[in-house]
């Protein structure tokens, strides 16, 4: 193990952190540290002196450089689809080449035991039973690659489309709307009437539609932005989404289905992550809540999400790679829909 320590505003106290990690579990092969975000040569000297006292090798020392910085906004890092990371990547590469002892790093790496991995599944060899449309553009880009691969392993051919730029959904048997930043593209999304209408028609025909977080927001009747302006969205979820100034939910939760959903039968429990600034406000009294959720950074218990026979939309970010039954059930439901078209 090589520990990377953020040394900003630290001197020899960085050595206490290194010592704690090194001594906490004697079975871990602790190879050394890389000092990150140093402010000057004098700063580096002070931190190195602390490491020398406890006998921890310093593999490298990286200085602070704003060119390495990734821009952020209310939900964390700005997606790579909106920025050109070339300068940051080149700056990091040059710093590592100059300031990290790569020979020592490789020697540590080659001394590690071999990691046994299962044979990768060749998704191209799997018979494709259904086509699933995946919304992917600047507004919807929060996907775990392994999660999408899990759908392919169950026999789905993924067809990517853009709710921002395309006029209609593709010819598919199911739809997936991932998370993202729809609130940053509200004018474009709300103005694309033909796209919204094609989604409404697909819903009316019973097409399975699965949505997470930003996808949920887009499927609601409207989104209220940070300034209070209202933008009409798809409208298949009877609720409005309202952006709030403070973070509403963050953390891993267990979601237990309150009814049958696209991911499984009632009482099926799944694990996922929530992180959102908006609230969903139902516009009907008898709202079909999808899940009862428990957990989060500040543990809570509450109902969330929307579920009908063919729609499941919630703030939950799910990795299908860790929910094999959910992936299977969704693809099977798409196959049933295809057979009945």
Regions found by a protein language model. Name each.
Residues 128-204:
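Phosphate-binding active sites in nucleotide-utilizing proteins
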Residues 126-128, 140-152, 157, 243, ...:
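C-terminal and late-domain segments of enzyme folds
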Residues 1-8:
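Inter-motif core of Ras-like GTPase G domains
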Residues 22-28, 49-54, 124-127, 167-169, ...:
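Solvent-exposed alpha-helices and their adjacent loops that cap or buttress functional pockets
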């Amino acid at each position: 193990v090589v520990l990377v320590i953020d040394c900003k505003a630290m001197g020899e106290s960085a050595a206490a952190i290194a010592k704690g990690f090194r001594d906490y579990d004697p079975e871990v092969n602790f190879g050394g540290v890389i000092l990150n975000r140093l402010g000057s040569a004098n700063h580096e000297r002070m931190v190195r002196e602390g490491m020398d006292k406890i006998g921890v090798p310093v593999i490298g020392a990286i200085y602070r450089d704003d060119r390495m910085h990734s821009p952020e906004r209310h939900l964390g890092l700005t997606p790579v689809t909106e920025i050109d990371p070339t300068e940051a990547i080149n700056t990091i590469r040059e710093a590592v080449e100059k300031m990290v002892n790569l020979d020592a790093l490789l020697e540590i790496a080659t001394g590690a035991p071999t990691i046994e991995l299962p044979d990768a599944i060749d998704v191209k060899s799997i018979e494709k039973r259904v086509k699933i449309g995946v919304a992917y553009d600047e507004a919807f880009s929060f996907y775990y690659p392994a999660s999408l691969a899990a759908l392919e392993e169950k026999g789905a051919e993924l067809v990517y489309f853009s709710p921002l730029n395309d006029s209609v959904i593709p010819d598919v048997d199911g739809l997936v709307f991932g998370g993202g930043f729809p609130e940053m593209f509200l004018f474009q999304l709300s103005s694309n009437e033909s796209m919204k209408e094609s989604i409404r028609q697909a819903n009316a025909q019973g097409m399975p539609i699965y949505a997470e977080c930003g996808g949920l927001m887009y499927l609601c009747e409207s989104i209220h932005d940070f300034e209070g302006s209202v933008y009409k969205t798809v409208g298949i979820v009877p609720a409005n989404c309202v952006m709030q100034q403070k973070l509403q939910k963050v953390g891993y939760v267990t979601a237990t289905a309150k009814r049958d959903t696209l991911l499984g039968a009632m009482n099926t429990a799944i694990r996922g992550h929530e992180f959102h600034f908006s609230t969903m406000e139902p516009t009907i009294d008898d709202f079909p809540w999808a899940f009862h959720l428990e957990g989060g950074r500040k543990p809570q218990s509450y109902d969330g999400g929307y579920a009908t026979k063919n729609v499941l939309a919630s703030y939950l970010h799910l990795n299908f790679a860790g929910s094999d039954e959910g992936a299977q059930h969704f693809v099977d439901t798409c196959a049933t829909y295809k057979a009945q078209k």
